[in-house]
Structures are given as structure tokens and as C-alpha cells.
């Protein structure tokens, strides 16, 4: 802890000696070219009916459709059982794990319901039009079956360390699941690839975009170009880095205690605020809903037409709910349960709730009418959402700022754990290795706060979505055993309305 705080303090003092505007510009100028190059490589496109469609998006779309059909629409009939599993009392002391199922869900939600649920959705709608909102939610529905697979496999293939703590997630079910099928030659390299991508995804999507958009919102509500923080975004990043360092050193149990309180509170606050904006524009609801559906299938001002809108919506959906990335499976592996299928059902709620929150952002923006005369690049996503809230009540941007900070901090906390587990999977368990990762993670909070939003968005989507490549490959391979386990689970729990 002292090492992390001392390093951050030293960096803070050294940056004070440089003109603030130059610090932000220097960071963006020297980091952005590398992030742009990575994004272009991962989002390699092919042309379909005149639209450039990234191959990786098609990869995830096909997986969502396949697993939804393969598991017979579990996203629809499994929700009630998911709630039942979440509220039931623990089965006894035999349940192994670090955190309860609810704590695991809260931590996973805090990782997915980040600033992307506000800023990312706003940016996607400004680019893809109102129709993007439809495809963002559709992507969440398709992603639920994928999340079920990930959480179930994470618990099934988790490992218990010598100190009694749990390690699990895609790294482990890729390595051990394929080894069990005599495919170690494939499992080892894919697990290593996933761990590397998870670290990258944690540093970008779980870190840099969160602090970047939060810093922009704080600067926006404190005067914009006249704000005392204008040009000093790195100062806000340094403060956040210190706060995160204080939390993450408590490990998963400490993280779970924070997220269990933070996640329900911030979700409730955002939903109430969103409802006020929506109800204030009640007369516009029918026409706005009709516009969303119409633009989803017949967009009027989007490059690539319907395919352009679908790709923009699905791309944001994946970044928001993380289905296919396997990230949340890392914390689900730590859940106190003997039934891996049971935790899979609980995971359905995470993706569904994330989709609902994204809908609230979409509705607030579309219903308020702030999309008119909005041009991407001239305004950040969080500012667009802020304008929607401000259109109803003048001080709402302040409330949104509080929500944005809560969303960002919770995501920063959860992804520090995901990245840490990927780091120790590669380098081995050990206190020094954990501290090293935490230092690196906190330094990138400062870097992310000062970068241009366009560079952040591109590398965030690229690194997060790239995690789907090794993860989804193994989901296909291990799907038959999860289907058998699910059939057995349903039989034992007298859920005979679905036959496998």
C-alpha cells in the first residue's frame, strides 16, 4: 500500500512542475497513435451490402444467436429462477468460495455498469442514431445465454489456492477444460492469450474510459474551459488513483463489501433520475419509441444503413454488458455455491440489468430531443447525457456527475480484480506480483484521465471485444458438457417445462 501511494505521490509532484495543458496534450499525443493502431487491427472490416462490418462483431453476434437457440431461450425462461437463486438462503457451510452469490453479482454489475452505460451509449446514439438503442438492448438479450455459459464454467473449473482463496474465470476453464478434452495444445496458448487481453481490457475499458469520461463531466459542470480543472484532468486522475489504491488492497472480500453497498445505491439513483427525465417528456414517448424502432430498421442518416446501425449498437452492447468477454466470470468463480449451473442462472440478471440501464440512458437522450445539432467529436458522451438531464432540471448535471463518479469508481474497483487475476495467472500468485499490477493499474488511471475521448473509445472497444476471440472458441467446445449439466440440474430441481 505504501509503495503504491508513494509512487503516485511522486508522480503527482513531478507533474506539477510541467505546465498542465502540456501534460494532457503530451499524454494524448504519445499514447493515441498506439491505441489507434491496435483498434484498427482488431476491428478489421469486411463489406456487407455497402457497410463495413468488423469481423469480430459478426463473431459475437453469431455466438449470441447460437447459444440462445442452443440453450432454448434461457434468457427468457431462466430469469425467474435466477431471482430465486439470488434470494435463497445459503445451503450451509459446505458452500465454498470467497463471496456470496449476491456479492458476486454486485461486483460483476459494478464492473459492467460503468461509465459506458452513460457515456458509451450516448456516443453510440449520436453516431448510429436513435435506432442504435434498439440494437444495444437486443445485444444484451443475446448476450445473456453467453453469460450463463461463462459463469457456469467459471465455477466448475475454479481452483482453490493454498491460502483458501479462489482463482477462476476463462483463463482456467480454457486451460483445464480443454486439457480434460485432451486439447492441452490449444488450451495453454488460448488461456495465455485471454489473460493478456484481459489485462489490456482492464486497463482500457475497466480503467481509462471510466476516469476519462468522469473527468470530462467534472470539468463540464465546473465551468468547462473556465473550470479550475480544465487542462488539469491528470489531477483528477491522480486523486482517483489514490482512492482506488486504498480499496483494491483489501482483495475480493474488501471489494465485494464496497460494491454490495455501492452498486444497488448507484443503480437506484440513476433509474430514478432517468425516470424523471422520461416522465418529463411523457408526451413525446410514443413518437420517440416509434422513431427508435423505425431507425433501427430504416436509419436515415447513418453510414452503412441498417448494418451500420446494427454494428454500432452491438459494438456498444458488448462493451457495456461484456457478454462474450468472460470478464465477469472471474468474480463469479469466487461465489459461495456448490452448483455451477445455479451461478450461471444468477449471471443472467447481470446482463439483463445492464441492458435495462442502457435503455434508460437511450430513452433520456432520445425523449429529451438533445440529439439535434449534436456532432460526435465536439462533445463527449457524458456531456450529451448531461444535456439530456439538464433539459428537465438545471441542477441534474450535478446529480449525473455524482452517478458518473460512482459508476466509474465501482468499475475501476471490479476491473482491478479481474486484471489482477489475469496477471497472477500469467506470473503466479504472490503479494509482490499483486502490488506490481496495482501500481501499473493506478498509473493508467492518471494516463486515461488526460487522453482524448476518441482514442479512449477505440482502444476500449478493441481490447474488450478481442477477449471474445479465445473465450468464445472454448465456449463452443465446452457447450455440450454445460448442456448436459443443465439438463441434470433441471431434472433435480423439478423444472420439467424445458426439455434438453
Question: Which role fits each region the language model picked out?
Answer:
Residues 73-101, 123, 129-133, 145-186, ...:
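Flexible loop linkers connecting adjacent transmembrane helices
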Residues 3, 59-62, 67-83, 208-218, ...:
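Membrane-interface loop-to-helix entry segments
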Residues 67-68, 110, 139-166, 175-212, ...:
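Helix-loop-helix module between adjacent transmembrane segments
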Residues 2-115, 125-132, 143, 476-500:
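N-terminal alpha-helical transmembrane segments of multi-pass membrane transport
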Residues 150-162, 273-291, 302-304, 333-335, ...:
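Extracellular/periplasmic helix-exit of transmembrane alpha-helices
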Amino acid at each position: 500500500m505504501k509503495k503504491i501511494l508513494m509512487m503516485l505521490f511522486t508522480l503527482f509532484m513531478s507533474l506539477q512542475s510541467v505546465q498542465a495543458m502540456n501534460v494532457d496534450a503530451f499524454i494524448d499525443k504519445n499514447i493515441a497513435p498506439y491505441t489507434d493502431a491496435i483498434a484498427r487491427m482488431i476491428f478489421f472490416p469486411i463489406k456487407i451490402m455497402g457497410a463495413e462490418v468488423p469481423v469480430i462483431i459478426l463473431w459475437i453476434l453469431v455466438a449470441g444467436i447460437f447459444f440462445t437457440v442452443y440453450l432454448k431461450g434461457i434468457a427468457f425462461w431462466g430469469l425467474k429462477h435466477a431471482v430465486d437463486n439470488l434470494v435463497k438462503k445459503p445451503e450451509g457451510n459446505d458452500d465454498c468460495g470467497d463471496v456470496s452469490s449476491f456479492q458476486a453479482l454486485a461486483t460483476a454489475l459494478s464492473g459492467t455498469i460503468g461509465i459506458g452505460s452513460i457515456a458509451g451509449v450516448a456516443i453510440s446514439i449520436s453516431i448510429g442514431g436513435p435506432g442504435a438503442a434498439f440494437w444495444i438492448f437486443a445485444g444484451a438479450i443475446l448476450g445473456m445465454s453467453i453469460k450463463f455459459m461463462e459463469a457456469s464454467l467459471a465455477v466448475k473449473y475454479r481452483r482453490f489456492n493454498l491460502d483458501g482463496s479462489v482463482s477462476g474465470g476463462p483463463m482456467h476453464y480454457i486451460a483445464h477444460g480443454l486439457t480434460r478434452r485432451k486439447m492441452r495444445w490449444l488450451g495453454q496458448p488460448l488461456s495465455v492469450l485471454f489473460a493478456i487481453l484481459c489485462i489490456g481490457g482492464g486497463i482500457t475499458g475497466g480503467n481509462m474510459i471510466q476516469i476519462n469520461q468522469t473527468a470530462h463531466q467534472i470539468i463540464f459542470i465546473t465551468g468547462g474551459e473556465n473550470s479550475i480543472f480544465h487542462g488539469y484532468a491528470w489531477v483528477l486522475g491522480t486523486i482517483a488513483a489514490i482512492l482506488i489504491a486504498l480499496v483494491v488492497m483489501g482483495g475480493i472480500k474488501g471489494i465485494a463489501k464496497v460494491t454490495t453497498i455501492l452498486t444497488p445505491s448507484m443503480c437506484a439513483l440513476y433509474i430514478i433520475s432517468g425516470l424523471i427525465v422520461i416522465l418529463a417528456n411523457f408526451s413525446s414517448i410514443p413518437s420517440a419509441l416509434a422513431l427508435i424502432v423505425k431507425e433501427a430498421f430504416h436509419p436515415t442518416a447513418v453510414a452503412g444503413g441498417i448494418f451500420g446501425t446494427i454494428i454500432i449498437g452491438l459494438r456498444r452492447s458488448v462493451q457495456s454488458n461484456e457478454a462474450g468477454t468472460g470478464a465477469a466470470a472471474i468474480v463469479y468463480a469466487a461465489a459461495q455455491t456448490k452448483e455451477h449451473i445455479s451461478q450461471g442462472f444468477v449471471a443472467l440478471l447481470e446482463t439483463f440489468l445492464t441492458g435495462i440501464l442502457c435503455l434508460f440512458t437511450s430513452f433520456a437522450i432520445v425523449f429529451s430531443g438533445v440529439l439535434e445539432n449534436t456532432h460526435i467529436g465536439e462533445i463527449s458522451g457524458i456531456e450529451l447525457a448531461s444535456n439530456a438531464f439538464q433539459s428537465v432540471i438545471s441542477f441534474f448535471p450535478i446529480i449525473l456527475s455524482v452517478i458518473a463518479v460512482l459508476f466509474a469508481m465501482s468499475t475501476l474497483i471490479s476491473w482491478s480484480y479481474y486484471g489482477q487475476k489475469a496477471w497472477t495467472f500469467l506470473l503466479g500468485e504472490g503479494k509482490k506480483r499483486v502490488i506490481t499490477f496495482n501500481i501499473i493499474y493506478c498509473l493508467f488511471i492518471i494516463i486515461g484521465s488526460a487522453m482524448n475521448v476518441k482514442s479512449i473509445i477505440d482502444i476500449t472497444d478493441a481490447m474488450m471485444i478481442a477477449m471474445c476471440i479465445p473465450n468464445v472458441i472454448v465456449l463452443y467446445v465446452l457447450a455440450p458438457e454445460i448442456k448436459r449439466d443443465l439438463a441434470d440440474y433441471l431434472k433435480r430441481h423439478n423444472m420439467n417445462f424445458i426439455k434438453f
